[in-house]
Amino acid sequence: MAIVKCKPTSPGRRFVVKVVNKELHKGAPHAPLLEKKSKSGGRNNNGRITTRHVGGGHKQHYRLVDFRRNDKDGIPATVERIEYDPNRTAHIALLCYADGERRYIIAPKGVSAGDQLIAGALAPIKAGNSLQLRNIPVGSTIHGVELKPGKGAQIARSAGASAQLIARDGVYVTLRLRSGEMRKVLAECRATLGEVSNSEHSLRSLGKAGAKRWRGVRPTVRGVAMNPVDHPHGGGEGRTSGGRHPVSPWGFPTKGAKTRGNKRTDNMIVRRRK
């Protein structure tokens, strides 16, 4: 993995910083694990915009990633290759199981082609192996953590993400997340050892607006640049600061306002995030 700063041969190249990984597979993805991915342009079935700043971008296929790994317990797998996935910040690994089946998983950091991985209670403590939380030693770094047994990984799935198992108490274990939050999770939930690959993702710089458009991201217009009919911050004579605390176009507080409202799982949070 190398960080490459491009030479300023043009204005669009001047600020480009790329993350180059020579281990990534250069060919086509595994076709049986691809699915069609339709673009909505941020519109719903009425044609109205429900998600702003979405539209255009390169065509993509969705890669079917196995977030459970619970039906392959005890079956060893060989990592065939590490691949780029346009649908997520992390890389993905193509596994070939001893029974001949191939599946994609989130690629853990340090795992490369040729490595042997396995899931199940008897799996060794090694990056990329999947176990129930009750079988993972306290202090271990993990990712791809389930919140409900059998539902599949939900916590720590993006590039460079991880959590730490810091305590075990009865049917629960306590995890420390990257945000600083400490929360309880059922010990029968699964997790994968190690941290997610491509931790250098945050160091890249796209360099120009067009690179965002290739990814299907449209421009964001500031509220203070709009008219009063379009945004609470709009209007005014000359340039203004908006005249109130930052809000969304619909008047809800933004830029730091807390939005969590899931009281049902409040008792699972030992310490709120920082």
Curated annotation (Swiss-Prot):
This is Large ribosomal subunit protein uL2. It comes from Pseudomonas putida (strain GB-1). One of the primary rRNA binding proteins. Required for association of the 30S and 50S subunits to form the 70S ribosome, for tRNA binding and peptide bond formation. It has been suggested to have peptidyltransferase activity; this is somewhat controversial. Makes several contacts with the 16S rRNA in the 70S ribosome. GO terms for cellular component: large ribosomal subunit. Belongs to the universal ribosomal protein uL2 family. Residues 28-55, 224-274 are annotated as: Disordered. Gene3D superfamilies: 2.30.30.30, Nucleic acid-binding proteins (2.40.50.140), Ribosomal protein L2, domain 3 (4.10.950.10). Part of the 50S ribosomal subunit. Forms a bridge to the 30S subunit in the 70S ribosome. Keywords: Ribonucleoprotein, Ribosomal protein, RNA-binding, rRNA-binding. One of its GO terms (molecular function) is transferase activity. GO terms for biological process: cytoplasmic translation. The gene is rplB. InterPro entries: NA-bd_OB-fold, Rib_uL2_dom2, Ribosomal_uL2, Ribosomal_uL2_bac/org-type, Ribosomal_uL2_C, Ribosomal_uL2_CS, Ribosomal_uL2_dom3, Ribosomal_uL2_RNA-bd_dom.
